[in-house]
Amino acid sequence: AFNDGKLEPAVVVPINGSPQDIAMSLSGKQCAVASPWSRQVTLVALENGTEGQTLPRKTAEARLPFAPGLQAFCRDDTLLVVADAFGGQLALVDPRNGKLLGTRLIEAHGIRGLAASRDGKSLHLSHQRIESAAPTTRNRVFWGQVISNILRSISVDHLLEDDGKRSGGAKLVAHWSLYPFGSPSKAAGDPGAVTVGTLGTTMVALGGVDRIGLRPKPGHVFEEIEVGDRPVAIALGPLERYGYVANFFDDSISVVDTAAAEVVRTISLGPERKLSSAEKGEKLFYDAKLSLDGWYSCHSCHPDGHTHGQLNDNLGDDTYGTPKRVPTLLGTSNTGPWGWIGNRTTLWEQVEKSIETTMRGGKPEPPTVEALVAYLELFDTSPPGNAAVDSSAVARGRQVFERLKCSKCHRPPTYTNVGTYDVGLQDETGQGFYNPPSLKGLQHRSSFLHDNRAATLSGALELHQPVSIRSLRRTDHADLLSF
């Protein structure tokens, strides 16, 4: 409600698991709420009260096999498409009952734009795609061969097809049209919000480089336009004459004349204040211009501080040809040393090396590193999920963990330590000694071990096989996984 110039809550609906995205149905009679950490989508009916007020009512909850992010209603509100908050999966949900109809997989991570065409026949996604085998040499980064920035359009009919071809339980999406953003010397890191008008106007936020892409009709080339600092949301006005772009870091709205393809007005949302070191670090974290030509930012591989879960060949272990899983940064300030082989003893050193050799942005100035470190120190571990947990199994699992002396490598409270250990899993160069990753937030990882060779935690234990686990009873094994 809007009272005396202030917005106030009119009705509060409890939603589990730290909700982060809301999508409205085309009719306006329903919304969907995504909660990434609990891997849940909550469906809410928006009913009219006797006095004209809106009365929200939870109608269903959909449990997903991945963390949900953006959502879009399609097909006259009979289909809800839910995008992966970190990786490249899509879920198809029946919004009438919350039933999961299936999951789909595309070669993607960082899906930050999702919009259905007005006729409901196509779905448009902005995302990035990493080439895990491509080393982060200057030449590879320059040509956009490490991370590409993409607008992908997929037929909704094709999404609903099921030919049985699967990868890890999800059907592979085989047909699409693809538009790559960026070119050498003028890349377009971190594509974000997408809006598609009824007349065919399409606008895409290029958040990492402070530009938007604009095309008047499908099939036309996008024209890139400079806007404010990190555009994150876009709306089209009547007759699509103007587009309105919300810029996150400078608190402004850019008004774009879509015919002239230029900003005609900038609306300030208030005076900017002096930023703390951590706030400066936040701006840098989302700034693709920190990399060579602007191909990608820290956020590209560590979406909102977490991880896209894929491999990157970035000299983290001082070698090429040995791609490793990108780790989460949540809680990272407490889990040193850094790097899979523990070869960075300070977070400062890790940040500096990442900018130089992963992003090829040159040697950063000390204030840049200082600000990024200050921002990373704010990252707490990811919250627990809300899935039903057997507390007695967790308690028994803790006892198994202690009895097997798992804490020798994974010491509470961070569940890691400063050493390196031979775990019997060598990389391409024969390297077998690794610094144990923290076990905090383990339930929010989609793959395990340094090269993602294990798709489940149980599979990781089978491959890792510490001596103490090899003769473990099945019930103790299950309890350990619960813990």
Question: What role is predicted for each listed range?
Answer:
Residues 12-16, 61-66, 104-107, 182-186, ...:
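Surface loop/turn motifs at the tips and blade-to-blade linkers of beta-strand repeat domains
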Residues 8-10, 52, 57-59, 101-102, ...:
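A structural motif specific to WD40 beta-propellers
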Residues 1, 17, 34-41, 61-62, ...:
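Contiguous, function-dense segments enriched for cysteine-driven chemistry
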